Amino acid sequence: MKVEVQSLDASKKGSIELNDAVFGIEPRADILHRVVTWQLEKRRAPTRATRERSDVARSGKKFGRQKGGGTARHGDRRSPIFIGGGKAHGARARVFNPSLNKKVRALGLRMALSSKAKTGTLVVIEALDVEAKTKLLAAQIQSLGFGPKVLVVDGDTVNENFARASSNLVGLDVLPAVGANVYDILKHDTLVLTRAAVEKLEARLNG
């Protein structure tokens, strides 16, 4: 698959041949769903349990007589209706640490990249060489017509000037190639890859 390469000022920089094993496979909704669900579950923090009736440190003895007192019938003081009693149907401790096969994760990333290539929302640029000026970068991004939400993926590290210029731009996120993931790719309207990012992703996913 051949894709045109451009610069941030919209000038032509030739073309690049994308590996079909990484950018040309047929996306499957079930695989993408599994990977995104796994990612979001991994982000969740463990929950702390509340003390229910059996967890409260109080006597289990019936504290009043059943009949003749003129009051409602009660058992012990651990009941949820009393101050200091256990919580009714309280939260239980949960640890979110799902597992997903590495091959499925890699397949999901290839499918996410292929999905962007298939829909024409994958853009390859030469490099992220810009001045560290937010105003200039915002004008360039707007002139390129990338859409409201853009994910830019660079090579080993993100260009420092680009990172500074883009830090205050709403809807523009930047990642190094090692941080590319299914959730962020699908969440954005346009995926922008540098030549270095393409090389890194193909080396990572074509093994």
Curated annotation (Swiss-Prot):
Disordered: region residues: 44-82
Signal peptide stretch: none
Single GO molecular function: rRNA binding
GO biological process terms on file: translation
GO CC annotation: ribonucleoprotein complex; ribosome
Pfam families reported for this sequence: Ribosomal_L4
Residue stretches of biased makeup (Basic and acidic residues): 44-58
InterPro entries xref list: Ribosomal_uL4 (IPR002136), Ribosomal_uL4-like (IPR013005), Ribosomal_uL4_dom_sf (IPR023574)
UniProtKB keywords: Ribonucleoprotein, Ribosomal protein, RNA-binding, rRNA-binding
Top-rank taxon, per record: Bacteria
HAMAP family attached to this UniProt entry: Ribosomal_uL4_B
NCBIfam families in UniProt: rplD_bact (TIGR03953)
Free-text function comment from the UniProt entry: One of the primary rRNA binding proteins, this protein initially binds near the 5'-end of the 23S rRNA. It is important during the early stages of 50S assembly. It makes multiple contacts with different domains of the 23S rRNA in the assembled 50S subunit and ribosome. Forms part of the polypeptide exit tunnel.
Family designation: Belongs to the universal ribosomal protein uL4 family.
Subunit (UniProt): Part of the 50S ribosomal subunit.
Name by which UniProt lists this protein: Large ribosomal subunit protein uL4
